């Protein structure tokens, strides 16, 4: 399993880091078989797995439940778990309690938090307690209400400068990596050059130290539309719908199950059920 040290070395050597979300045992198992460097159990599960309109309703219990399943499916892959909405904006003591629960109960190797400002002290607090933290800047889904929706961040000089400053503060606070979401590729490149920790981009161009995508977006599974920055490498959704539709048709027309899908008993045993009268 790769560790923080390996990821730093990969950045130094210019080897891109691959990160993919996973939310359950089978998706984690497949991600590990595909040799993904890092798995993110994102609170995006609220939207792509639980059917919410945003990540806001996701709870600490949800994150623990899904991370435990991912851990069972990917025993040899570094796992990062999101701290969900408002689980780290309370007191530092409550933040630590939530962080401890996620790490101890789920087996996550690191936690991810969104934003800067007061979150910087949270990164430092968790780091000092021995919990590795991945920072997340740019478009932060838990704050879409404040940001005015799912929009590209850092497009003007003033906001770009703020993102650069925040990125440096995240690193100084002890973050082991930084996710940059929906920022101009030129800005992402500048930030990557000025940090020693790896940057993982999602909608941040190619000049970052790694990439992350949502599992369901990448394989077109249960999604109707995807963001501009997503490349769909395959479409399992069409095959799944086709297979289920065929199953429904065959059941309705009594084509399934066939004899080869059924179990039998000896004729004398069948007759014995009725005392030999049938």
Curated annotation (Swiss-Prot):
Q: Name its cellular compartments.
A: Cytoplasm
User: Can you supply a Gene Ontology BP term from the record?
Assistant: pantothenate biosynthetic process
Listed cofactors: Mg(2+)
The EC number(s) this enzyme carries: 2.1.2.11
The primary location reported for this protein is: cytoplasm
User: Record's Pfam families?
Assistant: Pantoate_transf
From the UniProt record, give the pathway where this protein acts. Answer: Cofactor biosynthesis; (R)-pantothenate biosynthesis; (R)-pantoate from 3-methyl-2-oxobutanoate: step 1/2
- According to its UniProt record, this protein's enzyme class is transferase
| Enzyme active site | 181
InterPro entries in alphabetical order:
Pantoate_hydroxy_MeTrfase (IPR003700), Pyrv/PenolPyrv_kinase-like_dom (IPR015813), Pyrv_kinase-like_dom_sf (IPR040442)
**What keywords appear on the UniProt entry?**
Cytoplasm, Magnesium, Metal-binding, Pantothenate biosynthesis, Transferase
Query: Could you state a single Gene Ontology molecular function term?
Result: magnesium ion binding
> What does this chain do?
Catalyzes the reversible reaction in which hydroxymethyl group from 5,10-methylenetetrahydrofolate is transferred onto alpha-ketoisovalerate to form ketopantoate.
Family the UniProt entry places it in: Belongs to the PanB family.
Instruction: Supply the NCBIfam families for this chain.
Output: panB, PRK00311.1
Q: How does it assemble?
A: Homodecamer; pentamer of dimers.
The name of this protein is 3-methyl-2-oxobutanoate hydroxymethyltransferase
Source organism of this protein record: Bacillus cereus (strain G9842)
């Amino acid at each position: 399993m790769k560790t923080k040290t390996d990821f730093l070395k990969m950045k130094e050597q210019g080897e891109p880091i691959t990160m993919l979300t996973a939310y359950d045992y089978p998706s984690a198992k497949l991600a590990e078989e595909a040799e993904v460097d890092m798995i993110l159990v994102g609170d995006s599960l609220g939207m792509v797995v639980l059917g919410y309109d945003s990540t806001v309703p996701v709870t600490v219990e949800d994150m623990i439940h899904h991370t435990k399943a991912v851990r069972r499916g990917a025993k040899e892959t570094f796992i990062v778990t999101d701290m969900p909405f408002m689980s780290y904006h309370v007191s530092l003591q409550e933040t630590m309690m939530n962080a401890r629960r996620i790490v101890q109960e789920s087996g996550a190797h690191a936690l991810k938090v969104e934003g800067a400002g007061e979150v910087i002290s949270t990164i430092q607090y968790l780091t000092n307690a021995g919990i590795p933290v991945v920072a997340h800047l740019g478009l932060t889904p838990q704050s879409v209400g404040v940001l005015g929706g799912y929009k590209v961040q850092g497009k003007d000089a003033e906001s770009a400068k703020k993102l650069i400053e925040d990125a440096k503060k995240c690193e100084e606070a002890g973050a082991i990596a930084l996710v940059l979401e929906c920022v101009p590729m030129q800005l992402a490149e500048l930030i990557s050059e000025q940090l020693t920790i790896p940057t993982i981009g999602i909608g941040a161009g190619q000049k970052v130290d790694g990439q992350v995508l949502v599992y369901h977006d990448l394989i077109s599974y249960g999604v109707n539309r995807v963001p501009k920055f997503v490349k769909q490498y395959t479409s399992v959704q069409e095959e799944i719908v086709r297979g289920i539709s065929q199953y429904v048709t065959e059941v309705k027309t009594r084509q399934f199950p066939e004899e080869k899908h059924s179990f039998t008993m000896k004729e004398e045993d069948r007759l014995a059920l009725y005392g030999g009268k049938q």
